[in-house]
Amino acid sequence: MGISFTVLSSGSTGNVTVVRNGETTLMIDAGLSAKRIDELLAMRELTGTDLDGILVTHEHSDHIKGLGAMARKYDLPIYANQNTWGAIEKGIGKIAEHNKIILETGQHRDFGSMRVESFAISHDAAEPVAYNFYDGKEKLCVATDLGYVSDKVKAAISDADVLVLESNHDIEMLRMGRYPWNTKRRILGDLGHLSNEAAGAALSEILTGRTKRAYLAHLSRDHNMMDLAKMSVRGAMEDRGCFYKDSEFRLCDTYYDRPTPWDKVSQS
């Protein structure tokens, strides 16, 4: 059947993505209330009972707000590295011991024919990760909350059929915005979030003929807009000599208030 996915919600207020392959259905993060996650799942004809587990990227509230409630309600295993478990355990409430699963950074785990592999990213959290999903020859990468894209991250995200990649802010909108300077400095720093320009620069370096789509994710509601993000990302790519036709590669939207359509990774 191959990999398909939907980004249920993406942004500074909450992040939830679902990846499935016919045998297994996994959720990445649970950054909204359990009630809201259930509503978004229903929009894609799913319920919590369809889920086989939750993969955690890091401990910030916009990624774990509903984590404990979802795990308890549906008896779901939670997969996270040891340091992330240490950062989330007190805040998410009681979790059954059999649902506390350690997946260390760089390790992989097979769920039937789908392999999940985590890799380290740069963010101001205990031990943040992003995830690659493999099934046969298919590869999906989900990577947000990056201060910058290191050479190791470029290697990890390259050659994906589809990417979900952070494009958090427009630098000038952030600089002129209402946040205090220490918050702006954190967002702009190497442990912060990826700007539109940085996302475009990264794509220009890793894009191959195999990669058909990139979903721009984790957009700031205060310091970005989807049309601006797509224009800036494409401009940054073209500035670096990376030109493409829409028939070859597309930049796709994500939303904070509704899910993206199901997307089959293998579609042309």
At which residue positions do the language-model features occur?
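Metallo-beta-lactamase
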Residues: 82-130, 134-137
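Cap/insert and terminal regions of metallo-dependent hydrolase folds
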Residues: 151-252
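Active-site neighborhood of phospho(di)ester-bond hydrolases with catalytic His/Asp-centered motifs
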Residues: 28-31, 51-59, 79-82, 141-144, ...
